[in-house]
């Protein structure tokens, strides 16, 4: 294997996936940022969840809101539902892994909060149940998906927003998800605290 050629292929595939996504998802990123800004202005918070690399994305997003993104500004309320190992293991052990996020949402979610639900396949059962719990708690959902949107896309309500990456490879979809998360942070900061060049 020519490793340099392989790396070039991976870079090229990532660039092309981002280019293709840019052609379709920009309006959805704008809408998602506006939805989150409205929630934050109304004293709501943003809960986030996902599995594996998407768990990392959920935490990445919440830490950028809670701590900081690129500028000094007040902390913004966000909770990643992927981090409390005692809660996660006890729910999985006593009930089911499919309920690890939904049970937390039923306890922490308030009407007007937003759920950022992340899955490259759109088919992770615990993320699907998280969306159902969010709807029961009168929360709107921003879904970061890929492929055909899976079961998540079918579950979304008209007031929810899906940002679907038009790609099939999990790693490439995740690479665009991270870019979308940084776009959301940038747009949220600019809408709440004024634009910065
Ligand atoms: O990061 C990766 C692959 O790039 C993996 O950890 C991946 O996130 C896991 O297999 C997830 O369980 C996949 O779940 P999903 O994206 O289909 O919801
Ligand atoms: Zn990954």
From Swiss-Prot:
Pathway(s) served: Carbohydrate biosynthesis; D-glycero-D-manno-heptose 7-phosphate biosynthesis; D-glycero-alpha-D-manno-heptose 7-phosphate and D-glycero-beta-D-manno-heptose 7-phosphate from sedoheptulose 7-phosphate: step 1/1
GO CC annotation: cytoplasm
GO molecular function: carbohydrate derivative binding; D-sedoheptulose 7-phosphate isomerase activity; zinc ion binding
GO annotation terms (biological process): carbohydrate metabolic process; D-glycero-D-manno-heptose 7-phosphate biosynthetic process
Enzymatic reactions: 2 D-sedoheptulose 7-phosphate = D-glycero-alpha-D-manno-heptose 7-phosphate + D-glycero-beta-D-manno-heptose 7-phosphate
Family membership noted in the UniProt record: Belongs to the SIS family. GmhA subfamily.
Function: Catalyzes the isomerization of sedoheptulose 7-phosphate in D-glycero-D-manno-heptose 7-phosphate.
Note: The reaction produces a racemic mixture of D-glycero-alpha-D-manno-heptose 7-phosphate and D-glycero-beta-D-manno-heptose 7-phosphate.
Record's protein name: Phosphoheptose isomerase
Native source species: Azotobacter vinelandii (strain DJ / ATCC BAA-1303)
Lineage: Bacteria, Pseudomonadati, Pseudomonadota, Gammaproteobacteria, Pseudomonadales
């Amino acid at each position: 294997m020519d490793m340099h050629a392989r790396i070039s292929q991976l870079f090229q595939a990532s660039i092309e996936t981002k280019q293709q996504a840019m052609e379709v998802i920009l309006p959805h990123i704008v809408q998602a940022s506006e939805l989150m800004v409205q929630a934050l202005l109304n004293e709501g918070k943003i809960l986030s969840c996902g599995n594996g690399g998407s768990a990392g994305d959920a935490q990445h997003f919440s830490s950028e809101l809670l701590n900081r993104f690129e500028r000094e500004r007040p902390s913004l309320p966000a909770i990643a539902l992927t981090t409390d190992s005692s809660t996660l293991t006890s729910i999985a052990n006593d009930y089911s892994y499919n309920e690890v996020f939904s049970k937390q949402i039923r306890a922490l979610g308030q009407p007007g909060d937003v759920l950022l639900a992340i899955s490259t396949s759109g088919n992770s059962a615990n993320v699907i149940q998280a969306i159902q719990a969010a709807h029961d708690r009168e929360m709107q959902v921003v879904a970061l998906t890929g492929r055909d949107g899976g079961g998540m896309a079918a579950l979304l309500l008209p007031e929810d927003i899906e940002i679907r990456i038009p790609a099939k490879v999990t790693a490439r979809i995740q690479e665009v998800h991270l870019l979308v998360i940084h776009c959301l942070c940038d747009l949220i900061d600019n809408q709440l605290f004024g634009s910065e060049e």
